[in-house]
């Protein structure tokens, strides 16, 4: 895709799905990308980014906290500020998915010929009616998260990000319109520590090559880019590819990079709605009734930040930095990490190296048993006598079996708690379409 700020990597491997635990210790199913895989910045506010993790599913609410889980009712009736607050409440690194992140996924799909279909016709795809999801009572045509076929995922496989086209509109952060002027928090800054309030100084205009701010003029059924403030205000919608540009300017490439103007050669029936009066936040994707007008690059800029309705929800994302620990569920923001304990045991000889390897295996068992001092335990293991090692080897097999049983018990308990909390029973075959 020639208009991208960085070259997005074409599909070379299966999407990486990970379970990430928030500060409450509850799991989210996320799809994880390196910055280069999506063409996103590798630095946020002077911190090096290791990975971006995107909610695989439109979020549901459990005890007032958003989670990315399959076969759940998507959370709706959430206004823009509340969506931001809920996502950030999950802990360090968590945020409302930004427009930069959303559009990067869209460009990835376009570049790899996997533009997703979705629930655009009350439980099914308008263009492929054989593609259906699971509707639910009171949903008015909405489907449970991730209940559609793989064609509803951004990469066309079971491992992709689900439901970016249709089902419910989704809030995105880091972009807005102010009296028809598009404004952004640049360089994906809304992903970490940004002030996205109405009066925030972080909002920036987008400029033409001549240095004039860009405005969208909504008038007489058309939406036209121009370098001056519109004379009046209006509300309307047009096909995304039918956005016009006044003859005395060119559409800035930055607008294309942000999915605010169609990239060269892009073709689609997706719609672009805008109200040029006052501040307007952005929704993406369309809903279950938008038909051909829905899609990844579909946009609505018609409502205030306080507006909430049953057709609009959201999904969280999180960012992990280079200095964070190697576990995805640790999103500690401290730049200064504690120095690791130095190992005083050296094993230059053959027998010593074998003991060192045994110590590492015993240390893993110790950590699995929730030991509080794995480094200290490893030193004890390396200093152990042959007789102690022989006894430990016999006991370790029993300990491993106990750990496996405990893990299975904990997993079962989580599943039972989740089922009790949501009161949703997942069946192998569901014919509950409205």
Label the predicted regions.
Residues 2-4, 15-18, 134-140, 147, ...:
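C-terminal, surface-exposed recognition/capping segments
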Residues 12, 16-93, 179-224, 280, ...:
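Extracellular adhesion/carbohydrate-recognition regions
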Residues 40-164:
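Short aromatic-cysteine micro-motif
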Residues 350-355, 362:
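N-terminal acidic leader/helix
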Residues 357, 377, 401-417:
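Beta-rich interaction/scaffold domains
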Residues 369-378, 386, 398-402:
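Charged, low-complexity interaction regions
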Residues 384-388, 392:
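Amphipathic, non-membrane alpha-helical rod segments
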Residues 426-434:
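Long, low-complexity, intrinsically disordered segments
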């Amino acid at each position: 895709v020639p208009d991208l700020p960085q070259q997005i990597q074409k599909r070379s491997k299966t999407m990486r799905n990970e379970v990430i635990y928030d500060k409450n210790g509850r799991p989210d199913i996320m799809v994880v990308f390196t910055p280069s895989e999506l063409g996103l910045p590798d630095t946020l506010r002077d911190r090096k980014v290791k990975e971006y993790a995107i909610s695989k599913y439109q979020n549901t609410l459990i005890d007032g906290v958003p989670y990315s889980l399959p076969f759940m009712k998507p959370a709706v009736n959430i206004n823009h500020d509340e969506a931001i607050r809920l996502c950030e409440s999950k802990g360090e690194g968590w945020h409302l998915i930004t427009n930069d992140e959303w559009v990067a996924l869209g460009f990835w799909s376009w570049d790899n010929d996997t533009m997703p279909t979705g629930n655009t016709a009350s439980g099914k795809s308008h263009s492929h009616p054989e593609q259906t999801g699971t509707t639910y009572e009171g949903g008015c045509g909405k489907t449970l998260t991730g209940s559609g076929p793989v064609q509803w995922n951004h990469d066309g496989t079971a491992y992709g990000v689900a439901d970016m086209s249709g089902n419910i509109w989704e809030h995105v952060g880091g972009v807005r319109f102010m009296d028809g002027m598009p404004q952004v928090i640049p360089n994906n800054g809304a992903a970490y520590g940004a002030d996205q309030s109405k009066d925030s100084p972080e909002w920036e205009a987008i400029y033409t090559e001549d240095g004039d701010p860009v405005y969208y003029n909504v008038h007489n059924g058309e939406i036209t880019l121009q370098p001056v403030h519109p004379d009046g205000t209006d509300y309307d919608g047009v096909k995304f590819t039918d956005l016009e540009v006044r003859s005395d300017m060119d559409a800035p490439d930055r607008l294309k990079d942000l999915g605010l103007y169609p990239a060269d050669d892009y073709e689609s029936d997706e719609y672009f709605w805008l109200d040029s009066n006052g501040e307007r936040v952005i929704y993406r994707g369309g809903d279950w009734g938008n038909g051909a007008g829905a899609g990844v690059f579909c946009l609505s800029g018609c409502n205030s930040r306080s507006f909430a309705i049953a057709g609009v929800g959201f999904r969280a994302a999180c960012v992990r930095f280079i200095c964070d620990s190697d576990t995805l569920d640790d999103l500690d923001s401290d730049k200064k990490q504690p120095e690791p304990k130095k190992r005083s045991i050296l094993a230059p000889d053959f027998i010593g190296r074998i003991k060192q390897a045994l110590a590492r295996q015993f240390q893993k068992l110790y950590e699995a048993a929730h030991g509080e001092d794995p480094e200290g335990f490893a030193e004890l293991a390396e200093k152990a006598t042959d007789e102690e090692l022989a006894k430990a080897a016999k006991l370790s097999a029993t300990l491993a079996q106990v750990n496996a049983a405990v893990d299975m018990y904990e997993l079962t308990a989580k599943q039972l708690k989740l089922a009790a909390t949501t009161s949703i029973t997942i069946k192998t075959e569901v014919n509950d379409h409205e």
